[in-house]
Amino acid sequence: MSSIGTGYDLSVTTFSPDGRVFQVEYATKAVDNSGTVVGIKCKDGIVLGVEKLVTSKMMLEGSNRRIHSVHWHSGLAVAGLAADGRQIVSRAKSEAASYEKVYGEPISVKELADRVASYVHLCTLYWWLRPFGCGVILGGYDRDGPQLYMIEPSGVSYKYFGAALGKGRQAAKTEIEKLKLSELTCREGIVEVAKIIYGVHDEAKDKAFELELSWICDESNRQHQKVPADLLEQAKVAAQAALEEMDAD
């Protein structure tokens, strides 16, 4: 890509002759090389899942989290550069707190997604900034019910029934499309997300990984929370069993 973009990839404010912004494309590459992130909208809430690649055997379990709470009713999962993701989380928390202070009510998921997307896009407009090397899947529960958005490094934001980022995004999207999300509960969704992440993990190329899961549903009192340890373990067992069954076939 560098040979094609020579002279046009030095600044995010420079377009190539064919209308491309190479700095944004490079940022997207950072997302594509990350562990897989999946988000689905079930009939009673949202489930977020992350394939958090373990870079060292010395790393403590649970460190370097990829799923973060933004407000009591919303959370986001990060694919790409973790440090860039933390900056977006910080901004999202600030926007949520500011909105509630001014208007006296929790920020809607759509408004939060729009504000975060505008902030991400801002970093593609000025030469002294660089695009964020991460993408996020934002989920929440507001007066309109469960909502799911994906924000890309370019600042583009779309609403989804199911979304995926990272290395296994294409395979994950294919599996998500097979699910009847309108009939799926979050308890069932946890297992399905675990199966997808275990299924797209490439043991030959990738390191070991840690499964992160969170949900926002009636069972969690419509608050963004980590999936309880017992349900997480059940999901892992079901996913591993499905993977072994697939290998046996």
Curated annotation (Swiss-Prot):
InterPro entries: Ntn_hydrolases_N, Proteasome_alpha, Proteasome_alpha-type, Proteasome_asu_N, Proteasome_sua/b. Its main location: cytoplasm. Keywords: Cytoplasm, Nucleus, Proteasome. GO terms for cellular component: cytoplasm; nucleus; proteasome core complex, alpha-subunit complex. SUPFAM superfamilies: N-terminal nucleophile aminohydrolases (Ntn hydrolases) (SSF56235). The keyword Cytoplasm applies. The 26S proteasome consists of a 20S proteasome core and two 19S regulatory subunits. The 20S proteasome core is composed of 28 subunits that are arranged in four stacked rings, resulting in a barrel-shaped structure. The two end rings are each formed by seven alpha subunits, and the two central rings are each formed by seven beta subunits. The catalytic chamber with the active sites is on the inside of the barrel. One of its GO terms (biological process) is proteasome-mediated ubiquitin-dependent protein catabolic process. Belongs to the peptidase T1A family. The proteasome is a multicatalytic proteinase complex which is characterized by its ability to cleave peptides with Arg, Phe, Tyr, Leu, and Glu adjacent to the leaving group at neutral or slightly basic pH. The proteasome has an ATP-dependent proteolytic activity. Disulfide bonds: none annotated. PROSITE patterns: PROTEASOME_ALPHA_1, PROTEASOME_ALPHA_2. This is Proteasome subunit alpha type-3. It comes from the Eukaryota. The keyword Metal-binding does not apply. The gene is PAG1. It holds the Pfam family Proteasome. It is found in: Cytoplasm; Nucleus.
